[in-house]
Amino acid sequence: MLRIPGKSLGYHEDISLTPWQAILASVIVLLGLKVATILYTAFYNVFLHPLRRFPGPVTWIAAPWMKSISHIRGQQDHQIVKLHQKLGHIIRVGPDTLSFTEMSAWRDIYGTGHAELPKHIYKGSGMEERPNIITAHSRDHHRFRKAMTPALTPEAITHEEALIKGYVDMLIEHLHKFAKSSDPYVNVSQWYTMTTFDIFGDLCYGESFNSLATGKQHLWLKSMSSMKVLVPLLVFPYISWLLVWWLLSPEQQRSLSDHQKRSYELTMKRIANRDTHPRHDFMTFMLRNRGEDQGVTDHELASNSDIVISAGSETTSTALTGITFFLCSNPDAMARCAKEVREAFKSDDEITFKATAELPFMLACIEETLRMYPPVPTSLIRRTLPGRPTLIAGELIPENTIVGVHHLATYRSERNFFDAKAFRPERWLAETRNDPKSPFKDDRLDAVRPFSYGPRNCIGRNLAYHEMRLILAKLLWHFDLKLKPGYEDWGFKQRTFQLWEKPKLVVEFKERQFQV
C-alpha cells in the first residue's frame, strides 16, 4: 500500500493507493506530461520557431509525423509541388526544414562558394553506418570520389563503349523478336532496367548479371523494389527496424538481407581475381589504393559498388522509360526526333557515343524529359552550419536548418519555365533560346540539375548521358513506337519514394519500314 500525504494535495487525510493504483496514476501522469510536451512543441513550432516567417502546411510543421506518413504513402513530393505553386519559391515543409525552387539556391546550398553544408542523415536510421559516396561526410566523400573518378573519365568511358554497345545490341535483338511476334507489346521499364543493370554489373564486377541473356530479372532487381519501399521508413529515428519488420513482407525482408550478402560476395570475388582480370573496369581503378590511408577498405568497396550499380542502373533506366513515355505521348516530337536520327545514320554501325552527341533535337528531348520526370524527384537535403546564419536565395537561414532544392517542384514551376507542365523539347534548342520572340526565352534552363550540383554532383553523369543517347538513337533507328492503350497517364500518377515507383510501361514495337 502506497501512502501519499493528504495535506500536500489539500486533503485532511492521507491517501492510500494499492500498487496497481499507484502504477496507473504514474502512467496517467506520464501520459499527461507527454501530451503537454507534444502540445507545447507544436505551439512552439508554429508560433515561436525561428522559421515561423516562412509559409508551409501547419499540419507538417506542428506534427512532423504527418509528413512522414505522406512520404510512406508516396505522396510527399507531389504535395510539395502543389505547396510551392501555392506559397512561393521558399516554403517550410517541417519544423526545421525549408524547400526551395529558386535557381540561385543550387549554388547557395550545394556550391563551393562557402564551407560545405553537410548532408543531413537521419540519426538512428542506420544510414550513417553505411560508408558510401552518397552518405559519406566530406572527407570520406572526397576519398571515394578520388578512387572512382579515373573510371569515369572521357577516356575510360570511350574504352568501355564496345562493351556497352554489346548490351544495347542485345536489347535491340530482343525487341526485334517482340516486334515480329503476334504480341509486339513490351514492358520497356523492365527491359531498360535489365539492360542498364547488366551494363553496370559488368563495368563494376567484370561479369554480367545475364538479365538480357536469360530474359529474366536478376534477384538484385527484386531487392531494389524492396529498397524503394524501405527508404521512407528511415526517417523514423531508432524505430526504422521495427517499421521494416511490421510493414515489409518476410519475402521483402529476406530479399534485402540477401542483397547485402550478394553484394559483398561479388566484391570479394572481384578482389580475389584482381591480378587475372582481363580488362579495366570500375573495380580496377578503385582497387589501386585499396587498404592505404587514401584508399578504400573492402567493406567500403562493397558498399560503393552496391551504390554504383543500384543508383546508376535505376536512374538511367528511369530516364529512358520517361523519354519513351513522353515521346510516345507527343507524336510531333516523336516524328521529329525519329527523322533526325534516321537521317543522321545510314546504318546501325554508325550509331556511336560521339555521333549521338550531335543530334540537337534528340538531346533536347532527353533534357526535357529530365525536367518533366527527373530520376530523383525529391530534395537532396543539407543542414546549415551551426553558429551562424546562411544566405540562401536571398534569405538569411538560421543555423541547423535542413534545406534542399526540390527537383520536381523546381522543374515544374511556372516561375522558372513557360508552360512548365507541358513536354516542350524545343525550349532547349539554341535557336529558341536566341529568339527574342520565343515564349521560352526567359526559361531558367540552369535551374534543371537532375545530376545535382557542386562537389557532390553525380559522378556518373557523362556515362548516363552516353547510355541514354545510344539506346534512344538505336531504338528510334530500328523501330516505330506507340503506347499501348491504357498507359496515357503513366507519367502523372506515380508515387515517389526518393525515386519514382516506376510501374510498367507497355509500348508497341513495330519494325521500321526502310525506303527502297
Curated annotation (Swiss-Prot):
Residues annotated for heme binding in this entry: C458
Membrane topology: Multi-pass membrane protein
Major location category of this protein: membrane
Residues carrying a glycan: N187
InterPro entries in the cross-refs: Cyt_P450, Cyt_P450_CS, Cyt_P450_E_grp-I, Cyt_P450_sf, Cytochrome_P450_monoxygenase
Cofactor: heme
Keywords from the named record: Glycoprotein, Heme, Iron, Membrane, Metal-binding, Monooxygenase, Oxidoreductase, Transmembrane, Transmembrane helix
The keyword Cell membrane belongs to this UniProt entry's keyword annotation: no
Subcellular location: Membrane
Pathway: Secondary metabolite biosynthesis
Disruption phenotype: Leads to the accumulation of intermediary metabolites destruxin B, destruxin B2 and desmethyl-B.
One Pfam family matching this protein: p450
Record GO terms (molecular function): heme binding; iron ion binding; monooxygenase activity; oxidoreductase activity, acting on paired donors, with incorporation or reduction of molecular oxygen
Cellular-component GO terms for this entry: membrane
Transmembrane segments annotated in the record for this chain: 23-43, 229-249
PANTHER family referenced in this protein's UniProt entry, alphabetically: CYTOCHROME P450 (PTHR24305), P450, PUTATIVE (EUROFUNG)-RELATED (PTHR24305:SF230)
Function: Cytochrome P450 monooxygenase; part of the gene cluster that mediates the biosynthesis of destruxins, insecticidal cyclic hexadepsipeptides which induce flaccid paralysis and visceral muscle contraction in insects through targeting the calcium channels and vacuolar-type ATPases. The aldo-keto reductase dtxS3 converts alpha-ketoisocaproic acid from deaminated leucine into alpha-hydroxyisocaproic acid (HIC), which is the first substrate for destruxin assembly by dtxS1.
Similarity remark: Belongs to the cytochrome P450 family.
Record-given protein name: Cytochrome P450 monooxygenase dtxS2
Source lineage: Eukaryota, Fungi, Dikarya, Ascomycota, Pezizomycotina
Name of the gene encoding the protein in the UniProt record: dtxS2
